[in-house]
Amino acid sequence: MPEPHAVLYVTNELSHIVKNGFLPIWKLTGDESLNDLWLENGKYATDVYAYGDVSKWTIRQLRGHGFIFISTHKNVQLADIIKTVDVRIPREVARSHDMKAFENEIGRRRIRMRKGFGDALRNYAFKMAIEFHGSEAETLNDANPRLHKVYGMPEIPPLYMEYAEIGARFDDEPTDEKLVSMLDYIVYSAEEVHYVGCGDLRTLMQFKKRSPGRFRRVLWHVYDPIAPECSDPNVIVHNIMVDSKKDILKYMNFLKRVERLFIWDVSSDRSQMNDHEWETTRFAEDRLGEEIAYEMGGAFSSALIKHRIPNSKDEYHCISTYLFPQPGADADMYELRNFMRLRGYSHVDRHMHPDASVTKVVSRDVRKMVELYHGRDRGTFLKKRLFEHLHIVRKNGLLHESDEPRADLFYLTNRCNMGLEPSIYEVMKKSVIATAWVGRAPLYDYDDFALPRSTVMLNGSYRDISILDGNGAILYLMWRYPDIVKKDLTYDPAWAMNFAVSLKEPIPDPPVPDISLCRFIGLRVESSVLRVRNPTLHETADELKRMGLDLSGHLYVTLMSGAYVTDLFWWFNIILDWSAQNKEQKLRDLKRSAAEVIEWKEQMAERPWHVRNDLIRALREYKRKMGMREGASIDSWLELLRHL
């Protein structure tokens, strides 16, 4: 059966280009009715180019159809908003008539648009959940470490510990300058940072520009004789040399219970020193930083110390939890960073990291780390792994038990969880918001397996849990939480439809057929495909109609095709409560709820769309055809319908 497709809507100045392509083209006149649009879009089984007048439709209606807006201009006028285009085509590409360049531009942008979908779900989760499972750097970037508990199973970065493997080289990409990268991966939950050897503050100001939120929530004590004055109220400059813990302690207020981080990046000038003197000085500076941090271990949660590898020693000792390479460092820079887990208060539970202790270092092994991981053309993924490893609490969300509200985004259907489907459904039942991959098209960028859509619907829908596809979830949040998900959000609705999303949300009251639930693009085509491939699948429905009875074709085809994810509790309440009203009452409820639809049959406006027995017959027929293969209980839904 066809998978979700996108409608690639181009403004008129691009319509001549798409005519040179191989995707179908859909011309919109602006005179189409709701049902015309629904029926016509349903005929396409691939992404389709569209152009013409869409000004009478709202953003939610068009997103419901899978529209992505493409133009050389900034905006497109819709019925309710002026929409910022999703894909801005450079004018030189438009003038060139180069179809490959045009489609590459769309494809590259669509990959980036996936982030908009994930960010929107995370924004909702940040409002509703305390615990975050399956987390990566994207969650850390926006989490509040004083409120949120961030769990996951991130990839472990290259680390040096006694008797441990360093790890293998991996592909990487360029990143920020070395010291900016250092602040980027080490600063997360600390509220007070004591940064010794801060230099002229350029690094700190670059970090402020890169991550203003994290910069602002820290009180910075910076120590360096050359540090200039700073106008930022959260930066306190100390123009001193730090020789002992006393130089730091006098600036600490122990009446405040805060998480503190110690950074030591001290390097004196070489001046007239020979090689031996210079190496001895550097070695002593690094050890002094470790000693000061260790002596103040009760005041700091952790420390990050400069660590230069000596040329003249085959082995040496330092105080360390881990040594690791530096993202963005030059390939010939034989300097690591030394992370020390200390005993001070922390918002993040870092008990899985060993306490800092005296460690023997084999010089050839740590030099190998430099050779494997340093270089100006590397650092992005190293930095990400360090950030995740230091600040994400290592826990498997499928096994974790807690009473805290939790979010489970983008990990449940990782291939490592294959065979654990019962646990996945249990998590979706408990979670404030959870996602699972249901797309059947080849997946090139992620290592996920697909859950059957019909099983997800039958297993995932409860009175207080709504199950929708990812596009439906975004449309629902636009409708019910417009302060969290704005109408102008840029995302790829076709990509979103490859996910099932469970939300701890009750059925809307009244239970209106909003776009977020009722889209069923291509349902008529799905029904025809079933008939022309295997007419026995429709025999019971045909016979019932000859007898003057009925079953819900929408429900039956939805389940049989495996092409849709939608909430059954909400759907059944629509049929039994909302659709039982007359036209005036139906329209009143839609208006009062500010709901929108993309399918409307005028001939059914005054009548119920179906009755209880139609739904029961559809479920029974699905059970008769697929019951032996369906992993979810159908009988429980039949029993519920009898009493709903």
Swiss-Prot record:
It is found in: Virion. Its main location: virion. The keyword Isomerase does not apply. Keywords: Capsid protein, Outer capsid protein, Virion. InterPro entries: Orbi_VP4 (IPR007753), Orbi_VP4_C (IPR043026), SAM-dependent_MTases_sf (IPR029063). GO terms for cellular component: viral outer capsid. The VP4 protein is one of the five proteins (with VP1, VP3, VP6 and VP7) which form the inner capsid of the virus. Belongs to the orbivirus VP4 family. This is Core protein VP4. It comes from Bluetongue virus 13 (isolate USA).
